[in-house]
């Protein structure tokens, strides 16, 4: 039974999304429907957690807007996500960055991962 579910879910997985990690700064472009109109809204911030795997995979992005912390959780393979851009790679040692919730300003920054 498990193999059947995995086979069905594998067909619906998206392959056009980049491979990002915890601590990366990403721009998530989300389709927003308001009445009959549809537009694309961008949400930029730091990835503080990734959860589950397969079709049910989600990730949470955090940013500070007007002095107030805003977190938004997105389903990875949902059709409402138009695209994801990685703006900066982060260097972290934790799988979940919940400690960023308590920090403000420069203390809430994640070190940048330098690639050669």
UniProtKB/Swiss-Prot annotation:
Family matches, as SUPFAM superfamilies: Translation proteins SH3-like domain
Q: Which UniProt keywords apply?
A: Ribonucleoprotein, Ribosomal protein
- What GO cellular-component annotations does this UniProt entry give? cytosolic large ribosomal subunit
Q: Does the keyword Ribonucleoprotein apply?
A: yes
Q: Which GO terms describe its molecular function?
A: structural constituent of ribosome
- InterPro entries documented for this protein: Ribosomal_bL19, Ribosomal_bL19_CS, Ribosomal_bL19_sf, Translation_prot_SH3-like_sf
Kindly indicate whether the keyword Hydrolase belongs to this entry.
no
Q: Which GO terms describe its biological process?
A: translation
Role summary: This protein is located at the 30S-50S ribosomal subunit interface and may play a role in the structure and function of the aminoacyl-tRNA binding site.
Entry's family note: Belongs to the bacterial ribosomal protein bL19 family.
Q: From the Swiss-Prot or TrEMBL record, give the protein name.
A: Large ribosomal subunit protein bL19
The record's gene field reads: rplS
């Amino acid at each position: 039974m498990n193999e059947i579910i995995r086979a069905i879910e594998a067909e619906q997985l998206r392959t056009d999304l980049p491979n990002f990690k915890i601590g990366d700064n990403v721009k998530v472009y989300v389709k927003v429907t308001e009445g009959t109109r549809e537009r694309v809204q961008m949400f930029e911030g730091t990835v503080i957690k990734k959860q589950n795997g397969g079709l049910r995979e989600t990730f949470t992005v955090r940013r500070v807007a007007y002095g107030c912390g805003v977190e938004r959780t997105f389903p990875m393979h949902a059709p409402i996500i138009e695209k994801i851009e990685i703006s900066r790679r982060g260097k972290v040692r934790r799988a979940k960055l919940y400690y960023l919730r308590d920090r403000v300003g420069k203390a809430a920054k994640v070190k940048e991962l330098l690639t050669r």
